[in-house]
Amino acid sequence: MSVPPLLRPPSPLLPAAAAVAAAAAALVPGSGPAPFPAPGAAPAGGISFHLQIGLSREPVLLLQDSSGDYSLAHVREMACSIVDQKFPECGFYGLYDKILLFRHDPASDNILQLVKIASDIQEGDLIEVVLSASATFEDFQIRPHALFVHSYRAPAFCDHCGEMLWGLVRQGLKCEGCGLNYHKRCAFKIPNNCSGVRRRRLSNVSLTGLGTVRTASAEFSTSVPDEPLLSPVSPGFEQKSPSESFIGREKRSNSQSYIGRPIQLDKLLMSKVKVPHTFVIHSYTRPTVCQFCKKLLKGLFRQGLQCKDCRFNCHKRCAPKVPNNCLGEVTINGELLSPGAESDVVMEEGSDDNDSERNSGLMDDMDEAMVQDTEMALAEGQSGGAEMQDPDADQEDSNRTISPSTSNNIPLMRVVQSVKHTKRRSSTVMKEGWMVHYTSKDTLRKRHYWRLDSKCITLFQNDTGSRYYKEIPLSEILCLEPAKPSALTPVGATPHCFEITTANVVYYVGENVVNPSSSPPNNSVLPSGIGPDVARMWEVAIQHALMPVIPKGSSVGSGSNSHKDISVSISVSNCQIQENVDISTVYQIFPDEVLGSGQFGIVYGGKHRKTGRDVAIKIIDKLRFPTKQESQLRNEVAILQNLHHPGVVNLECMFETPERVFVVMEKLHGDMLEMILSSEKGRLPEHITKFLITQILVALRHLHFKNIVHCDLKPENVLLASADPFPQVKLCDFGFARIIGEKSFRRSVVGTPAYLAPEVLRNKGYNRSLDMWSVGVIIYVSLSGTFPFNEDEDIHDQIQNAAFMYPPNPWKEISHEAIDLINNLLQVKMRKRYSVDKTLSHPWLQDYQTWLDLRELECRIGERYITHESDDSRWEQYAGEQGLQYPAHLISLSASHSDSPEAEEREMKALSERVSIL
């Protein structure tokens, strides 16, 4: 087939650029219609004219092809493309064959002259695009969907059968045209009735000037056959790349697409008589929505009505409103296409679901939540310039089973087991208005515009400008009290209303000018910011800001009474108890700064009022749990009180009220999961993984020595002390932790399913080897960016199949030692699973560079707890044998430490831990 001519609307560039652009485009092999022109004068042999569609007029340029001829077919293609982009709701299947072109001829009696051949079009003509009478009503109704695999964060339902889309990721298909959602099993049954509302754009906006978009499409557009190889969308859709319609979105050229039912079947069904539905009461075993009102069918059984012919589901109250459009039982090749049919239909796939190379920003954009395999994308991109593949061959290829070279596992993500907690807007203004005050250092009463947010009180010069007089951070407020007699009050001055006490100054706020026995003279209005009522509202607002996370329904007042209401006790890590201490007097909690959430509570950022030290405060709502579980709520505190190790997060203290428990811990930089997802490839290099895993194992060794099993080990619970490339890590979240002896077993439900060992999932007894399984999963997800197991298959079967556990992408880049360690940790039989010390002795972790990195970390933090002095001579000898440089400062450090009694004591303690574990 000859190279088609280029169709481009003119753009305001220089004539020289026009010739260069046109020549370059003409030299591109296999290039299709390039929608945007090189500007200025038309190239030799080119014809510039206008296409008019209704009230819209677009300039285009028709160039000669390689044979020197013009093609009317490409004028039609350009017209279809303009219709699709400017009037997507008006396009339909087969538009190309159902349009006529007329040339405006003012000199003729019949102004519109039918264009039969391309030579009828002259320079500067106005060509009218008219819909042929052969376009039937059925043509307008047939609009195929553009279906792509999609991952949902919120519960979603199939718009065909009404049932919920199940799974963690890739639960179903979303149409790019209309945004509807479907099961994969329903894709072959849904009618081709896409509305295309998501693709619509204003029809009065000219396409001229969008050169970057249209030019880009020219690079990808080839001679498009009548039946596209991928999902058959309306004619204009298949002639352009996705980047044309969705600027800035991820290209879907290599994503998995699904084809709906044959268009011929839709034409056949159009001729069928539509009759009323035959509804019968139905009991649903899965969550299902009414297909009329799109609301959930509630109840345990007999939730709604279902048509016994077409399986349409609805509420009883909605049945009278449902249109009489039942087509009965629709079958093709003996397969029932009604929504309720559960038959497994083989899908036609446009390309492989290549997702072993994960994007670090998984599902950040809900509309573009697909992930692609980079290697396969490059391979397909190289073959894209070649000749078109045989459609039948592609169809046979698409029906094959998934290749072991690609991973079908769940991509790594943050697993939340509790109610979804949204992050509140930062610095939200809680109250603002005029207020007066004086201080313990300056008795002159001043008036400012106060603005209270979640972190501070700002005293502005006026209510509109940005200049301010002073900031009072809430974390520095030590006390908020009603007014007391003060020697600083000037003689004869009106008293203040309440006091704000900080470490350096006391603010006397408000002016109590109105006494109960008198009223303002001449009934005059008080100046803004003056009066007891205004001051009282400010006092309450500040009290709420000081203790922002309070139980629902509890009232917060000021003064000593409120302290007695919400204060019970404080339990410090040294087990001392102080009665009637309010957490808001010691710490400021920032409700905007949500650090994390789990099954037992939410973690907020906070600050110690006197020292200004940053802390993390976990708030546990006791009202969410039955009385029997209250002991479990204190489990984390009880364990952390007895743990003092650099690899475990430090517990500062614990407060408790009748409704809540406040656990105050040291605040760290972030977590390991964030580090994995934010890395360049969505996974960590081996040397960083070794560095982190060694620290985790050392902390676990200390826990197991104390007979403590974490039971919920995952990257979210491994915190980073800094933003360094090689940070110190600490274990946190001991809410599931258990005291388990060396040979003891427990059966209680613990942990996060994605990281749990099989014995827990099967309700069998477990021991401390449970944590070692979790370490194996952490190593796997760190190196690959995916979870090791597919949710649809048995774990034991998947472990036996190495081809699916370790697909070449990315495991061909990872050492065999790492895979060997993972295999020894992911052992279904507990007795075969590696222990902590055996894991630390594995060749993958016995690495010289890792040892050096860990020693540098210990030097940086000033404490040696990861490596041991007994290994120094071994690694120094290894460096000499391999010709590697051994850091001189480590030699001097090891010599000085070996002579100290503290070093001997630490050595004996570490030795006793190892012996106890072994």
From Swiss-Prot:
EC numbers for this chain: 2.7.11.13
Biased composition (Polar residues): 400-410
Domain of life of the organism encoding this protein: Eukaryota
Annotated region described as Disordered, given as residue ranges: 338-362, 379-410
Keywords: Angiogenesis, Apoptosis, ATP-binding, Cell membrane, Cytoplasm, Differentiation, Golgi apparatus, Immunity, Inflammatory response, Innate immunity, Kinase, Magnesium, Membrane, Metal-binding, Neurogenesis, Nucleotide-binding, Phosphoprotein, Repeat, Serine/threonine-protein kinase, Transferase, Zinc, Zinc-finger
Function of the molecule: Serine/threonine-protein kinase that converts transient diacylglycerol (DAG) signals into prolonged physiological effects downstream of PKC, and is involved in the regulation of MAPK8/JNK1 and Ras signaling, Golgi membrane integrity and trafficking, cell survival through NF-kappa-B activation, cell migration, cell differentiation by mediating HDAC7 nuclear export, cell proliferation via MAPK1/3 (ERK1/2) signaling, and plays a role in cardiac hypertrophy, VEGFA-induced angiogenesis, genotoxic-induced apoptosis and flagellin-stimulated inflammatory response.
Protein family (similarity comment): Belongs to the protein kinase superfamily. CAMK Ser/Thr protein kinase family. PKD subfamily.
Protein name: Serine/threonine-protein kinase D1
